Amino acid sequence: MGKKAIQFGGGNIGRGFVAEFLHAAGYEVVFIDVMDSVINSLQQTPSYDVTEVSEEGESTKTITNYRAINSKTHEADVVQEIASADVVTCAVGPNILKFIAPVIAKGIDARTEERPVAVIACENAIGATDTLHGYIKQHTNPDRLETLSERARFANSAIDRIVPNQPPNSGLNVRIEKFYEWAVEKTPFGEWGHPDIPAIHWVDHLEPYIERKLFTVNTGHATTAYYAHKRGKKMIAEALEDPEIRETVHKVLEETASLIVSKHEISEQEQKEYVDKIVSRISNPYLEDNVERVGRAPLRKLSRKERFIGPASQLAERGQKFDALLGAIEMALRFQNVPGDEESSELARILKENSAEDATSQLTGLEKDHPLYSHVVERVSTVQQGSKSVL
């Protein structure tokens, strides 16, 4: 029998990142989703194209050998597919992990294969597979918890690839940047060894990869979006042509670089080259990346371990500089009531209905005695008072 991978999430990242590389590794991909339109399209279309875009031009790969199941209406089928799968991946958004965990738990519990299934969450969040693992354990019979590792192994991953808004009428086809990084920890697989997926960079310690990516790519991308939104710019590449925005982004990334260099023993030169590469990537006009797409979901982006508070809190604890990050945090707080983004409306409500202190605690999860807390309270208060900000 051929190799089989179950991919939760039939969206752009699921189709244009994860499935592309699973397909290239020789897996049949079974997409699982709850969106009727996505499942119907996948079921009715035998192939779709992934077009990789770079300054050198475009190249297109055709993806075939996939099926699709609606887990809302055909849960038993999903359980059976997981029971005989080699790999389970997901790209559903960190907030959705708790909703996919019950069916994955049932599928794992139904396994009789000797080799445990590899579970890899492909989300923009630190420790996403650990989070999913925790939810799966909650939905596993206590008598079966002790032997769970015989049926499944869970490995965290760091993913890095920009997927912009897609042109209208693209159907299942995905335009995506050519560059990618997919790092996955290999230690959880132990004596079984990791799955054979050549696109994955298998590592012993994932945290340096996750933090470097999250605190450089995601911090830089979101900083650009929030300053651009304040200035009424529509596209990320256009925003980075503005010398003031570009300089501000570099200042933010100098601060996160100082954390990454001191914490993870990455050389200053290596991190500087990484930062330059990232700024060049997000400046790519061929991606046609939209400011509102990059800025959406500000509540998640302002949370405790995310791209702003995560590095700023660690810098504050280490007594290092975090002024530019505070500016980015303020700009994120100003991303309110953006059409089509519920979190930006919720952010506006929280800032309107709470004191600066309560809003800071609610939005960032910072403890009141944390060295960053009072600085963020100040910025929250500034935004609440409608004061004009610099830049």
Swiss-Prot record:
A biological process term (GO) from this entry: mannitol catabolic process
Keywords: NAD, Oxidoreductase
EC number: 1.1.1.17
Oxidoreductase keyword on record: yes
Gene Ontology CC terms: cytosol
Transmembrane spans: none
Highest rank taxon of the organism: Eukaryota
Record protein name field: Mannitol-1-phosphate 5-dehydrogenase
The species this protein was found in: Aspergillus oryzae (strain ATCC 42149 / RIB 40)
